[in-house]
Amino acid sequence: MRNKFCALLVMVYVLSFVGFAEALTLRLAGQNPVAHQNSVQMENFKKIIEEKTGGKIKVKTYPAGQLGDYALIYEEVSKGTIDMALITIPPKFDQKQQIYFTPYLVSSWHELYKLFDPNGWMYKKVSGFHDKMDIKFLGFFMDGFGGLGLTKEASKPLDPKVPKNVLCRIPNNDVAKLTMTSMGYRTVSVPYADLYTALQTGVAEGWYGGAAVHSYLGFRDVVKYYYPMNIYTELEQWLINKKTWDGLSPSDQKLIESTVAEINKNAVKIAEQEEIMYQKKLAEAGIKVVKITPEQLKPTVDYVRKMVWPKLDKVLGKELTQELIGEYAKK
């Protein structure tokens, strides 16, 4: 009788863990509107993981900043109160995270495919940044390039030495300020959540960053001009809390990594197609989309690199800046 009772306890214990595994839910937070590819691919990730684990792992998605802006989401992933995220990385916890805003690391789609290779320099550096925050870095999701959405026309936008007479919103980071100042713009820092109102009321006359899709989905009612300046790589990152990650089986870890890798592999191609599509949509909405060829852009690229890159050591530190310049200066 005692043996039967012990066997029953063992069975209950085992079944409780099976039940726990079946009930595991990963909370995945994002920042962009539901129509944005970022949010679409969060749903794709959810579908793949749930199907391939037979429902053992479920994914609950929270797009469009439902759990807060990207700075808050990042902090909560670090704490473990949110399991996963696909977000922009705030620099408030580590100034070196501003490396993503380095202007003109690359300036063409062909170069963009190579920039964030999983075996490359940038990928390894970024992994180290997140390790310090108890976060596992899973990969880059490429949105394309950051352009300029303005409510008024810029003066000679392709001559960085000419004052543009536009007050442009930037995020609260030093690299963005260095970049826009070098291009002749006055700047004001406004939280992204308040950007629409700032553009509407004239607190800002434009905004730095965002591909055509962002200006269309979020600001087409207020911007009047879109300049595809390809200033920096517009991207988000897949993250998972380290404790959550360590609690997964090796096979589940492999599945998550491979799923993210496959999604990211297709992201640049989709972003390139969407840039064309959303530039067209912007034009159809009455916004002037300024066409810029690589040849026309090159003087700006060369000038901004010359003016901004050497100053990055004040933000990124001398060692990291020298590594960055050595890695990308000739590309």
In which residue ranges do the predicted regions lie?
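Bacterial N-terminal signal peptides
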Residues: 7-17
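Positively charged n-region of N-terminal signal peptides that target proteins for export
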Residues: 1-4
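N-terminal secretory/targeting leader peptides
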Residues: 22-111, 123, 130-131, 136-331
